[in-house]
Curated annotation (Swiss-Prot):
HAMAP family: HslU. Its main location: cytoplasm. One of its GO terms (cellular component) is HslUV protease complex. A double ring-shaped homohexamer of HslV is capped on each side by a ring-shaped HslU homohexamer. The assembly of the HslU/HslV complex is dependent on binding of ATP. It is found in: Cytoplasm. This is ATP-dependent protease ATPase subunit HslU. CDD domains: RecA-like_HslU (cd19498). NCBIfam families: hslU, PRK05201.1. Pfam families: AAA, AAA_2.
Length: 433
């Protein structure tokens, strides 16, 4: 769990996301409050609940990116789900408790990866012994093994093929029984039981280089205590887990509508206990959701936040409105973030030996085209820049292997030549941009 101050968290988010200072402040305070709660003792710690957030703003302005970067920064178990994927219990589809089960799987993978690093040195030695067994046999003399060990460490045997016994994945089918929350669990647990009883392995023919990572991971997993790993993962979910619920506006029930709305309202009702705090059964054990942070987001083009069930509105106390992107924002998105679009394209074409140079007038022209198309067709925010950039650089990307060593300067004239006419023609833009 990170102990960054809210100011440091905002500063970190500024490296990747342009603008939206209100949203950044809200999530930075929410993250800092997780750390503050963990400093409390006893009963008070249990009583302090997270203040869940509702982000309201058009598509492509940074809602998902803020949540994703926040989770990365926190090193917390994080899952992004679309609210529209879920149905009310009793309907065909996934029930909302599956969100927590998936979050536990994410946490287990995270903890396992971290613990593997702790036993990396021992695992590498054990993997090396298995490779030597495959190369010279288990009964080879110490002198022979030492000779081959030196060659192995020098990389001289990387291309040599060996046969190794590796763990076979259980491959057990997973069944979802509609209307039965957690029905999937039984099938998975059964598969695990039979997998462990059989201890199945399979022989694979691999090069020494390819076998290295597989064998190191297997040996590391043997050194890990799986029960302790699961306990740590569940603890991480319960105290630091973050769930990002996208498209929450699509499950709003609007006045005077019926039919499919029934299931939508049911999804909202199913979400209530999850956000308020309940215990969810997973195949790894029970998980309490009281201290999981929920960040819901939606464009709310048609529905309004007040169309959500009043109880659900009450469980999302912090409201943040994200602004639509201006021309200046578009320009900044192209150049300011550490991994801006222009830097990405320069690096990609640099691998072919092509040097791309963007003039200031080209950046202005790209921003103008994106804003123009967003205003005439459909406003998809910063995502429009990707479409425009692809169109502008289409010819260069295609012919790059034949143009190695060239320096290509992109200016406003170049941009207008490739997308200017399309941007002016709304009918063409609708299909091409």
């Amino acid at each position: 769990m990170t102990d960054f101050s809210p100011r440091e968290i905002v500063s970190e988010l500024d490296r990747f996301i342009v603008g939206q200072s209100d949203a950044k402040r809200a999530v930075s305070i929410a993250l800092r409050n997780r750390w503050r709660r963990l400093q409390l003792e006893g009963a008070l710690r249990e009583e302090v609940l997270p203040k869940n957030i509702l982000m309201i703003g058009p598509t492509g302005v940074g809602k998902t990116e803020i949540a994703r970067r926040l989770a990365k920064l926190a090193g917390a178990p994080f899952i992004k789900v679309e609210a529209t994927k879920f149905t009310e219990v009793g309907y065909v589809g996934r029930d909302v408790e599956q969100i927590i089960r998936d979050l536990v799987e994410v946490a287990i993978a995270q903890v396992r990866e971290k613990k593997r690093k702790d036993v990396q040195a021992r695992a590498q030695l054990a993997a090396e012994e298995r490779v030597l067994d495959a190369l010279v046999g288990a009964s080879a003399s110490p002198a022979t093994r030492d000779s081959f060990r030196k060659k192995l460490r020098a990389g001289e045997l990387n291309d040599k093929e060996i046969e190794v016994e590796t763990q076979a994945s259980s491959g057990s089918p997973m069944f979802e029984i509609p209307g039965m929350p957690g029905a999937q669990i039984g099938a998975v647990s059964l598969g695990d039981i039979f997998g462990k009883m059989g201890g199945r392995t399979k022989t694979r023919r691999l090069t020494v280089a390819d076998s290295h990572e597989i064998l190191v991971n297997e040996e590391a997993d043997k050194l890990l205590d799986s029960d302790q790993l699961t306990i740590e993962a569940i603890n991480a979910v319960e105290n630091n887990g973050i769930v990002f619920l996208d498209e929450i506006d699509k499950i709003c029930v609007r006045d005077g509508r019926s039919g499919g709305e029934v299931s939508r309202e049911g999804v909202q009702r199913d979400l209530l206990p999850l956000i308020e705090g309940t215990t969810v059964s997973t195949k790894h054990g029970a998980v309490k959701t009281d201290h999981i942070l929920f960040i819901a987001s939606g464009a709310f083009h048609i529905a309004k936040p007040s169309d959500l069930l009043p109880e659900l509105q009450g469980r999302l106390p912090i409201r943040v409105e994200l602004n639509a992107l201006s021309r200046d924002d578009m320009r900044r998105i192209l150049t300011e973030p550490e991994v801006s679009l222009i830097k990405q394209y320069v690096a990609l074409l640099g691998t072919e030996g092509v040097t791309l140079e963007f003039g200031d007038d080209a950046i202005d022209a790209l921003a103008d085209v994106a804003v123009q198309v967003n205003s005439t067709v459909e406003n998809i925010g910063a995502r429009r820049l990707q479409t425009v950039m692809e169109r502008v650089l289409d010819e260069i990307s295609f012919s790059a292997p034949d143009r190695s060593g060239e320096t290509i300067r992109i200016d406003a004239e170049f941009v207008q030549k490739h997308v200017g006419d399309l941007a002016k023609n709304a009918d063409l833009s609708r299909f091409i941009l």
